[in-house]
Protein backbone atom coordinates (compact mmCIF):
# COMPACT_ATOMS: atom_id res chain seq x y z
CA UNK A 1 0.00 0.00 0.00
CA UNK A 2 1.31 3.43 -0.92
CA UNK A 3 2.41 5.65 1.93
CA UNK A 4 0.84 9.04 2.62
CA UNK A 5 3.91 10.75 1.11
CA UNK A 6 3.72 8.59 -2.02
CA UNK A 7 0.01 9.34 -2.45
CA UNK A 8 0.70 13.05 -2.01
CA UNK A 9 3.50 12.91 -4.58
CA UNK A 10 1.18 11.07 -6.99
CA UNK A 11 -1.57 13.65 -6.47
CA UNK A 12 0.90 16.48 -7.02
CA UNK A 13 2.07 14.83 -10.23
CA UNK A 14 -1.49 14.40 -11.47
CA UNK A 15 -2.29 18.02 -10.65
CA UNK A 16 0.77 19.18 -12.60
CA UNK A 17 -0.33 17.12 -15.60
CA UNK A 18 -3.84 18.60 -15.37
CA UNK A 19 -2.37 22.10 -15.14
CA UNK A 20 -0.14 21.47 -18.14
CA UNK A 21 -3.08 20.10 -20.16
CA UNK A 22 -5.11 23.18 -19.26
CA UNK A 23 -2.61 25.45 -21.03
CA UNK A 24 -4.75 26.21 -24.01
CA UNK A 25 -4.15 26.54 -27.70
CA UNK A 26 -6.64 29.37 -28.11
CA UNK A 27 -6.05 32.09 -30.69
CA UNK A 28 -5.09 34.49 -27.86
CA UNK A 29 -1.52 33.99 -26.60
CA UNK A 30 -1.32 37.05 -24.32
CA UNK A 31 -4.27 38.58 -22.49
CA UNK A 32 -3.64 41.57 -20.23
CA UNK A 33 -6.43 43.07 -18.12
CA UNK A 34 -6.23 46.35 -16.17
CA UNK A 35 -2.45 46.02 -15.75
CA UNK A 36 -0.99 48.71 -13.49
CA UNK A 37 2.46 49.41 -12.07
CA UNK A 38 3.15 52.18 -9.55
CA UNK A 39 6.55 53.50 -8.48
CA UNK A 40 6.59 55.90 -5.52
CA UNK A 41 3.15 57.22 -6.32
CA UNK A 42 3.75 57.50 -10.06
CA UNK A 43 1.80 55.36 -12.52
CA UNK A 44 4.43 53.85 -14.81
CA UNK A 45 1.75 51.66 -16.40
CA UNK A 46 -1.83 52.81 -15.98
CA UNK A 47 -4.58 50.18 -16.21
CA UNK A 48 -3.80 48.84 -19.69
CA UNK A 49 -5.64 45.96 -21.36
CA UNK A 50 -4.74 44.25 -24.62
CA UNK A 51 -4.49 40.90 -26.38
CA UNK A 52 -1.89 39.36 -28.67
CA UNK A 53 -3.07 36.81 -31.21
CA UNK A 54 -1.32 33.51 -31.85
CA UNK A 55 1.09 33.64 -34.77
CA UNK A 56 1.11 37.43 -34.92
CA UNK A 57 3.89 40.00 -34.62
CA UNK A 58 2.79 42.82 -32.31
CA UNK A 59 4.67 45.97 -31.34
CA UNK A 60 4.61 48.14 -28.24
CA UNK A 61 5.49 51.63 -29.45
CA UNK A 62 6.03 54.82 -27.50
CA UNK A 63 8.57 57.40 -26.45
CA UNK A 64 11.07 57.03 -23.62
CA UNK A 65 9.20 56.50 -20.37
CA UNK A 66 5.97 55.46 -22.06
CA UNK A 67 5.89 52.20 -20.10
CA UNK A 68 7.00 49.70 -22.75
CA UNK A 69 9.88 48.07 -20.88
CA UNK A 70 7.92 48.03 -17.62
CA UNK A 71 5.09 46.24 -19.42
CA UNK A 72 7.45 43.67 -20.95
CA UNK A 73 9.08 43.12 -17.55
CA UNK A 74 5.71 42.34 -15.99
CA UNK A 75 4.85 39.94 -18.82
CA UNK A 76 8.12 38.11 -18.20
CA UNK A 77 7.60 37.95 -14.46
CA UNK A 78 10.58 40.19 -13.75
CA UNK A 79 8.29 42.77 -12.10
CA UNK A 80 5.13 42.15 -10.13
CA UNK A 81 2.18 44.31 -11.17
CA UNK A 82 0.56 46.59 -8.63
CA UNK A 83 -2.83 45.58 -10.03
CA UNK A 84 -4.25 43.62 -12.93
CA UNK A 85 -4.05 40.21 -14.58
CA UNK A 86 -1.67 38.62 -17.08
CA UNK A 87 -2.57 35.41 -18.90
CA UNK A 88 0.02 33.90 -21.24
CA UNK A 89 -0.48 30.68 -23.21
CA UNK A 90 -3.47 29.93 -21.03
CA UNK A 91 -1.68 30.34 -17.69
CA UNK A 92 -2.04 32.98 -15.00
CA UNK A 93 1.47 34.45 -14.86
CA UNK A 94 1.11 35.32 -11.18
CA UNK A 95 0.47 31.72 -10.09
CA UNK A 96 1.40 29.31 -12.90
CA UNK A 97 4.19 30.95 -14.88
CA UNK A 98 6.42 27.90 -14.35
CA UNK A 99 4.17 26.08 -16.81
CA UNK A 100 4.78 28.49 -19.69
CA UNK A 101 8.24 29.99 -19.12
CA UNK A 102 9.88 27.00 -20.89
CA UNK A 103 7.82 27.90 -23.98
CA UNK A 104 8.89 31.56 -23.97
CA UNK A 105 12.10 33.51 -24.39
CA UNK A 106 13.31 37.08 -24.34
CA UNK A 107 15.93 39.20 -26.06
CA UNK A 108 17.23 42.62 -25.09
CA UNK A 109 20.57 44.26 -25.82
CA UNK A 110 20.21 45.96 -22.43
CA UNK A 111 20.12 42.74 -20.39
CA UNK A 112 23.68 41.57 -19.89
CA UNK A 113 25.12 38.08 -20.14
CA UNK A 114 28.39 37.13 -18.42
CA UNK A 115 31.10 39.06 -20.28
CA UNK A 116 33.90 36.68 -19.26
CA UNK A 117 32.19 33.63 -20.73
CA UNK A 118 32.62 32.80 -24.38
CA UNK A 119 29.65 33.00 -26.72
CA UNK A 120 29.50 29.20 -26.75
CA UNK A 121 29.54 29.06 -22.95
CA UNK A 122 26.78 31.66 -22.68
CA UNK A 123 24.53 29.84 -25.14
CA UNK A 124 25.28 26.51 -23.46
CA UNK A 125 24.18 27.91 -20.09
CA UNK A 126 20.81 28.94 -21.54
CA UNK A 127 20.38 25.67 -23.44
CA UNK A 128 20.93 23.78 -20.19
CA UNK A 129 18.52 26.06 -18.32
CA UNK A 130 15.83 25.06 -20.81
CA UNK A 131 16.73 21.39 -20.44
CA UNK A 132 17.49 20.93 -24.13
CA UNK A 133 18.90 17.73 -25.58
CA UNK A 134 21.99 17.69 -27.83
CA UNK A 135 23.10 21.02 -26.40
CA UNK A 136 26.31 21.29 -28.42
CA UNK A 137 24.46 20.70 -31.70
CA UNK A 138 21.76 23.21 -30.75
CA UNK A 139 24.32 25.88 -29.88
CA UNK A 140 26.10 25.34 -33.18
CA UNK A 141 22.84 25.41 -35.11
CA UNK A 142 21.53 28.66 -33.62
CA UNK A 143 24.97 30.29 -33.95
CA UNK A 144 25.00 29.35 -37.62
CA UNK A 145 21.50 30.77 -38.10
CA UNK A 146 22.53 34.08 -36.49
CA UNK A 147 25.84 34.14 -38.39
CA UNK A 148 28.00 34.15 -35.25
CA UNK A 149 29.78 30.81 -35.67
CA UNK A 150 33.14 32.57 -35.85
CA UNK A 151 32.56 34.16 -32.42
CA UNK A 152 31.75 31.00 -30.44
CA UNK A 153 35.18 30.83 -28.79
CA UNK A 154 35.35 34.58 -28.14
CA UNK A 155 34.57 36.10 -24.75
CA UNK A 156 31.32 38.04 -24.94
CA UNK A 157 33.00 41.15 -23.53
CA UNK A 158 35.32 41.30 -26.53
CA UNK A 159 32.51 41.53 -29.09
CA UNK A 160 31.15 44.65 -30.73
CA UNK A 161 27.72 45.91 -29.66
CA UNK A 162 26.23 44.62 -32.91
CA UNK A 163 27.68 41.15 -32.36
CA UNK A 164 26.31 41.16 -28.81
CA UNK A 165 22.86 41.91 -30.21
CA UNK A 166 23.14 38.85 -32.44
CA UNK A 167 24.20 36.74 -29.45
CA UNK A 168 21.17 38.03 -27.54
CA UNK A 169 18.93 36.96 -30.41
CA UNK A 170 20.64 33.56 -30.53
CA UNK A 171 20.02 33.13 -26.81
CA UNK A 172 16.36 34.02 -27.31
CA UNK A 173 15.94 31.44 -30.08
CA UNK A 174 17.90 28.65 -28.37
CA UNK A 175 14.72 26.83 -27.28
CA UNK A 176 12.66 27.67 -30.39
CA UNK A 177 10.05 29.48 -28.27
CA UNK A 178 6.35 29.67 -29.03
CA UNK A 179 6.36 33.22 -27.65
CA UNK A 180 9.32 35.50 -28.26
CA UNK A 181 9.47 38.86 -26.48
CA UNK A 182 11.95 41.37 -27.86
CA UNK A 183 13.09 44.73 -26.49
CA UNK A 184 14.70 46.79 -29.28
CA UNK A 185 15.73 43.66 -31.25
CA UNK A 186 17.91 45.48 -33.79
CA UNK A 187 19.55 48.02 -31.47
CA UNK A 188 23.26 48.55 -32.20
CA UNK A 189 23.02 46.86 -35.60
CA UNK A 190 24.07 48.69 -38.75
CA UNK A 191 21.31 49.12 -41.38
CA UNK A 192 22.33 46.05 -43.39
CA UNK A 193 22.57 43.82 -40.30
CA UNK A 194 19.30 45.20 -38.92
CA UNK A 195 17.55 44.42 -42.19
CA UNK A 196 18.96 40.89 -42.09
CA UNK A 197 17.83 40.42 -38.45
CA UNK A 198 14.30 41.58 -39.27
CA UNK A 199 14.18 39.11 -42.13
CA UNK A 200 15.44 36.33 -39.86
CA UNK A 201 12.78 37.03 -37.23
CA UNK A 202 10.09 37.19 -39.89
CA UNK A 203 11.25 33.86 -41.35
CA UNK A 204 11.33 32.28 -37.90
CA UNK A 205 7.76 33.38 -37.23
CA UNK A 206 6.55 32.07 -40.59
CA UNK A 207 8.41 28.77 -40.23
CA UNK A 208 7.32 27.98 -36.67
CA UNK A 209 4.06 29.89 -36.26
CA UNK A 210 5.54 31.57 -33.17
CA UNK A 211 4.08 34.71 -31.65
CA UNK A 212 6.35 37.77 -31.37
CA UNK A 213 5.88 40.81 -29.14
CA UNK A 214 8.45 43.56 -29.51
CA UNK A 215 9.15 47.05 -28.22
CA UNK A 216 10.85 49.34 -30.70
CA UNK A 217 11.57 52.97 -31.50
CA UNK A 218 12.19 52.06 -35.14
CA UNK A 219 8.92 52.88 -36.87
CA UNK A 220 10.12 51.57 -40.22
CA UNK A 221 10.87 48.25 -38.55
CA UNK A 222 7.45 48.13 -36.91
CA UNK A 223 5.69 49.09 -40.13
CA UNK A 224 7.48 46.32 -42.02
CA UNK A 225 7.20 43.51 -39.47
CA UNK A 226 4.09 43.95 -37.38
CA UNK A 227 0.48 42.97 -37.80
CA UNK A 228 -0.63 45.07 -34.83
CA UNK A 229 0.73 48.13 -33.04
CA UNK A 230 -0.05 49.21 -29.47
CA UNK A 231 0.68 52.91 -29.14
CA UNK A 232 1.75 53.80 -25.58
CA UNK A 233 2.04 57.21 -23.99
CA UNK A 234 2.37 58.12 -20.32
CA UNK A 235 1.75 54.55 -19.23
CA UNK A 236 -1.47 54.07 -21.19
CA UNK A 237 -2.37 52.57 -24.56
CA UNK A 238 -3.73 55.53 -26.50
CA UNK A 239 -4.42 53.71 -29.78
CA UNK A 240 -3.96 50.35 -31.45
CA UNK A 241 -4.42 48.67 -34.80
CA UNK A 242 -2.52 47.53 -37.84
CA UNK A 243 0.14 49.92 -39.15
CA UNK A 244 -2.00 50.49 -42.24
CA UNK A 245 -5.11 51.34 -40.20
CA UNK A 246 -3.24 53.75 -37.95
CA UNK A 247 -1.64 55.50 -40.91
CA UNK A 248 -5.04 55.85 -42.59
CA UNK A 249 -6.86 56.99 -39.44
CA UNK A 250 -4.32 59.73 -38.75
CA UNK A 251 -4.11 60.63 -42.44
CA UNK A 252 -0.32 60.27 -42.43
CA UNK A 253 2.24 58.93 -44.89
CA UNK A 254 3.88 56.45 -42.54
CA UNK A 255 3.93 55.16 -38.97
CA UNK A 256 6.65 57.57 -37.88
CA UNK A 257 4.33 60.49 -38.63
CA UNK A 258 1.61 58.79 -36.57
CA UNK A 259 4.08 58.35 -33.70
CA UNK A 260 5.01 62.05 -33.81
CA UNK A 261 1.35 63.12 -33.91
CA UNK A 262 0.61 61.10 -30.78
CA UNK A 263 3.81 62.21 -29.04
CA UNK A 264 2.98 65.89 -29.60
CA UNK A 265 -0.62 65.57 -28.44
CA UNK A 266 -0.78 66.93 -24.89
CA UNK A 267 -4.07 65.23 -24.03
CA UNK A 268 -2.47 62.32 -22.21
CA UNK A 269 -0.38 62.98 -19.13
CA UNK A 270 0.93 60.63 -16.45
CA UNK A 271 -1.26 60.69 -13.37
CA UNK A 272 -0.06 61.01 -9.79
CA UNK A 273 -1.56 58.57 -7.33
CA UNK A 274 -1.33 58.58 -3.53
Task: Describe each PLM feature range.
Residues 176:
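Conserved catalytic motifs of ABC-family nucleotide-binding domains
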Residues 240-241:
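ABC ATPase "signature
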Residues 180-184:
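Catalytic Walker B motif of ABC-type/P-loop ATPase nucleotide-binding domains
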Residues 155-159:
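Conserved ABC ATPase signature
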Residues 195-207:
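Helical segment within the ABC ATPase nucleotide-binding domain
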Residues 124, 128-151:
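Conserved ABC ATPase "signature" region
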